[in-house]
Structures are given as structure tokens and as C-alpha cells.
Amino acid sequence: MITVVESSFLTSASALSQTPPPKNSEVVFIGRSNVGKSTLINLIVDSKGLAKSSSTPGKTQLINYFETIWKRGEERIPLWLVDLPGFGYAKVSKEMRKDWGEKLIHFLQERRSIKLFVQLIDARHPDLAIDAEAWAMIGAIKRGDQKVIRVFTKMDKLNRNDQKKLQQRYPDACFTAMLGKEGIASVRERVLKDVLGEEA
């Protein structure tokens, strides 16, 4: 069983130059505004208020760092979780979205301590072009020592037939209803396995 036994807010950064010096392996959470990044992070670390959601989606431009200790058996594994700004919010200007995109790509390319990208996708809207573009972008810039996984959120909003279809379509993805321990446990297991470079 994998648990997160310690978690705390580390720092926020609005530019690559403000990010903390690399110390531990990092897991980056990326996705559209309102997809549930903060909620998923809080569920993973079992803390309701660690990652804060903005009251105005798409407003926050900060890269937020969280320091965590994961436990598997007697092994304690330090990881940093990185919550990136949400993208694609309609009320943000095109110029601002472009600027954010360029900053994020630069960040993802230059941050050598990133070991895993976690892209969150709303299960109700699995075919949005902006999500496909983000997936392709990550695939284009990731290094050989990095991995990337999809996590479909809000699965509880689908009927069982649509849930099954989505799971069959993306057999390597993780699925969570943003509720319930089973889905979150599977995400924890996958995250740790991929960060450590372990086989399935």
C-alpha cells in the first residue's frame, strides 16, 4: 500500500527563474482550467486544503510547488508535486493564453528534475483539441527519462456504458471520479511506479 505521509506547500513561482533549486524528483500536473488539478492533488496527499483552487478559473499564473513524502512499506520517497496554471479558459485573452503557453513550454523543457507529466482531462469532454495539443506538446518535448500519463477526472458524471467505453479507448490511463479511495489509490500507484521507472 502506498500512502503520502507528509505534505506541505513549498513555494509559488511566476517564472522559471523563481522556481526552487532542483532537489527531488518532480511530478507535474497539467490540464485545462476547472479540470480538477487542485482537487486531485489534495486527494492524492489526503489533505483537503493543501492545493488551492482559484475562484476565477484561468486567473492564476503561478507554478505551485508542494513537498511530499510517500511511503511504500518501510521505504520513504520524497517527491515534489507541481501544479501548473490551468490553460484554455475562455475569459482569458488570446495574448495572455499565448504568453502562458510559451512560459509553460519553456518551464517544462528546462526543468530537469521533472520525471512525470500528469495530464488531467475531463471525462465528459475527452476529445477537445486543446487537450490533444497539450498531449502532443508534452510528447514532443519530454526526455527519455520522463513519462507521461493521462488521468480522466469526473468519471462519476458519465453513465457506466460511457465509462467503460472511455476505459477501453485509453487502457493506459488512470480514471478517477474525484471521489472514492479506489481511483485515487490507482493514481498514487501509477505515479510512484512511473517516477521510479518501475515496470508495470
UniProtKB/Swiss-Prot annotation:
Record bears the keyword Nucleotide-binding: yes
Where is Mg(2+) bound in this sequence?
S38, T60
**Would I find Cell cycle among this entry's keywords?**
yes
An example of a Gene Ontology cellular component annotation for this protein is: cytosol
**All copies of domain EngB-type G, residue ranges:** 23-197
UniProt record, GO biological process: division septum assembly
Record-annotated residues binding GTP? 31-38, 58-62, 83-86, 153-156, 175-177
Superkingdom is Bacteria
Q: Which InterPro entries match?
A: G_ENGB_dom, GTP-bd, GTP-bd_ribosome_bio_YsxC, P-loop_NTPase
Q: What Pfam families does this protein's entry cite?
A: MMR_HSR1 (PF01926)
Please give the PROSITE patterns that the UniProt record associates with this protein. G_ENGB
> What family does the Swiss-Prot or TrEMBL record give for this protein?
Belongs to the TRAFAC class TrmE-Era-EngA-EngB-Septin-like GTPase superfamily. EngB GTPase family.
> Per its database record, what is this protein's job?
Necessary for normal cell division and for the maintenance of normal septation.
What protein am I looking at? Answer: Probable GTP-binding protein EngB
The record lists the organism as Wolinella succinogenes (strain ATCC 29543 / DSM 1740 / CCUG 13145 / JCM 31913 / LMG 7466 / NCTC 11488 / FDC 602W)
Classification of source organism: Bacteria, Pseudomonadati, Campylobacterota, Epsilonproteobacteria, Campylobacterales
